[in-house]
Structures are given as structure tokens and as C-alpha cells.
Amino acid sequence: MGKYFGTSGIREVFNEKLTPELALKVGKALGTYLGGGKVVIGKDTRTSGDVIKSAVISGLLSTGVDVIDIGLAPTPLTGFAIKLYGADAGVTITASHNPPEYNGIKVWQANGMAYTSEMERELESIMDSGNFKKAPWNEIGTLRRADPSEEYINAALKFVKLENSYTVVLDSGNGAGSVVSPYLQRELGNRVISLNSHPSGFFVRELEPNAKSLSALAKTVRVMKADVGIAHDGDADRIGVVDDQGNFVEYEVMLSLIAGYMLRKFGKGKIVTTVDAGFALDDYLRPLGGEVIRTRVGDVAVADELAKHGGVFGGEPSGTWIIPQWNLTPDGIFAGALVLEMIDRLGPISELAKEVPRYVTLRAKIPCPNEKKAKAMEIIAREALKTFDYEGLIDIDGIRIENGDWWILFRPSGTEPIMRITLEAHEEEKAKELMGKAERLVKKAISEA
């Protein structure tokens, strides 16, 4: 992690570390880095969004950069608008699935991919130097407002085709996805039942679309006898899915299903995922001609590998999917349309999910101050190799150790002051045993850091 940017841009509590002053610096630094041109900016529904967005815009304009403000806009719409308007970069004001007191700044390249860590380090260097470009009064950037949502929907309709109509329960989580996702589903010919569709920074449910937060969605699917339930986080870069029986579909299972559908749709090829993805993905995709490539956690790492290898699909076991034939921006809205196309072609998700191997996956979050993370990881890496009998080791992001029918990943969060443990085993008893050892190891390492 850098001084300001983590694994998913800047993401901090508003008016603590993320202040209008810092946002102004980001705008000035980005404008200086670009040296001119045009930038698209949008925000999610957080109460601090206008404050941060206005500061970033001011910084950009002061360097002579033209700004297109698309207002309340999910991250996928910002990524689409960058290409639509021929912009040199994009900015999303969002903290994605974090609690409402957080906000963030994420910067996107002209191709829709997030800024790499190297590019973010350059922005940080400019921010700290204070050596910003200063446009004279007659060369200040121009500001205009636009709404690319209709163009987004029309473009998506050319890509996704349904032969039948379905009942879809859609939970936007009071986030920015509410201004696009329900409308796309209706244009596809589906009957849409909306939950939490009013844009608000006072979120009704936890934003991360998981089994716990989507209990109301699951119940509604059952009561309404819907074909599927779809949910988004605050900026709709993620998707959560509830099947036709009203059961939340685990991230790993859904990732396997949609990756398999993409292989059927576009032919065999490379599927990019992250080090926290389990064995099921490999086992399910191998017969379909899929070669799984693992990389660091974060959509920018997935997008980068997709671009390098010409991959068919990329995704994380967190509901973050990238469809390279569409864009290199993670897109939960377009993903929702693809889920309906998969159902239309292959059948109900409850039946499809039976084909995906099921292993026991456990996750834990251990509080860890950001300043202790580096030292704690040194201790964890050293002690883990002594504690566990392992056959394989992956250290591209944290440390992942493997031994036949199990694996454990230790990694510091890039967006929160926590240490993450993710593990998978074929047997539940073994998984619990491993997690017990792993949690004790991490807590001890943090106390010694």
C-alpha cells in the first residue's frame, strides 16, 4: 500500500484521513499527471460524496483539465463514460462496500482499467511535492454535466440477448446502481421487483452483498416465486446472487458458473482470478477448457492480467467480475444482465450450482492497525511455514500455503485496518482445525509487531 492509495484507491473515514483538502490535492495531482485533456467523474450515494467530488473537480479544473460530471453514477457507468466521451481518465467517488462513514477516490485509465499501484505512486509523489500545474485564468478547464445511462443501457442490450422474460428481485442497497440496474433489467424484458432502490447515504442494509445482508432479498425471491435475486454494493462494481429457491449463491460457486458460461459463450481460454479463490473454480472449469490464472487481490490486478493474457473472463470471489469483451471496469450491473442470459441459455441457477464442486471455505478478519501490518506479515510468513505442513507456496499477495486438499491465505486488507485469513479444505473438521491454528498465529503476530 502507498501513503494514500490502498488496493482499491483511497478509502478512509470522511473528515478524518479523507478530507476536502486531500481530495483537492488528488484533483491537482491527477491534472498535473495528465498534463491536460478530459476527465469523467461520478459519485455514489454517500452523504460526503458532493464534498469530495467538488474538491476533486476544483483541483482538476485548476490544472487546465476539462471535467465531465456524470453526477450520481455507479462505477460501471463511469468506466463506460470514459470510453463514450473519449476521456483521458475517470474518477469515482466511492467507498464501495465500506460503511457509510467512509468514502474514497478511485482513478481509472482511458481503457477503463483502474490506475495501477505504480501510477498511484506517481500521483502520491506529485501530491507530496506540491508541484502542481497551475493553469492561467484563460486556460482553466471547463466543466459540463452529462448522463450516459441511456447509452450504457443501449450498448448492453446489443451484447446481452434474452429469448424469455423473467422475474428479477433487485436489491440496489440504496447505492448508485439504483439509477441504472433496474432499468437495464426492464429493457431486457424482465419483470423487476426493486428493494432498497431509493438512493441514500443512510444504507438500510450492510453494503457487502453476502448471505447475511441479503436475507430480505432471499425472502422476497421465495415469496414472489422469482427466478433470481440480484444485489449490488454502494457503487455496483459487485454482484451478489440469490437463486430461484431463495438461497444465496456462494461467491465461489457463482464465480465458477459465470466463468463457465463465458467459456461456453466465447470458447476455451484463460480465466483470471485472485489468490483467495479456491479449488472449485479450477475443478469446474477444467473440463470446459478453462485455464485458471491467479493474481493479487484487487480488480486492477485482475484487469491487468486479462489484458496481458487475452483472458475470456476475470473475477474475484467477492462478487467483483470483469468482462473484457465489455470493459475492464468491474461491473456488477452488466454482470446482472449476463446472469439472466446464463439462466436463459442453461436453466435455473439452483440446478446449475449442483454441478460446481463444494468445499469448506472459512474466512476471518482480525483487527490490525495499518502501521503494524508489514511487521505482522513478516512474522506470519515466518511462523506459518513452521506451523503448517505444506507442499505449495504462493506469495504474490500475502502468503498462501497449500497441501493437497487444503490451502490457507494470510493477507493484510488494503482497505481496512484488518488482517484477513481465508482457507479452504475438503472436510469441515479439517477446516475448523486449520482456522483455529491460523487465528492464533495471526493474533500472536499482531501482538508482537
From Swiss-Prot:
Positions bound to Mg(2+): 96, 233, 235, 237
Calcium among keywords: no
Entries under InterPro entries matching the protein: A-D-PHexomutase_a/b/a-I, A-D-PHexomutase_a/b/a-I/II/III, A-D-PHexomutase_a/b/a-II, A-D-PHexomutase_a/b/a-III, A-D-PHexomutase_C, A-D-PHexomutase_C_sf, A-D-PHexomutase_CS, Alpha-D-phosphohexomutase_SF
Family designation: Belongs to the phosphohexose mutase family.
Record's comment on post-translational modification: Activated by phosphorylation.
Protein name listed in UniProt: Probable phosphoglucosamine mutase
Pfam family, one: PGM_PMM_IV
Keyword Metal-binding in record: yes
UniProt source species: Thermococcus kodakarensis (strain ATCC BAA-918 / JCM 12380 / KOD1) (Pyrococcus kodakaraensis (strain KOD1))
Cofactor annotation: Mg(2+)
Superkingdom: Archaea
EC number, UniProt record: 5.4.2.10
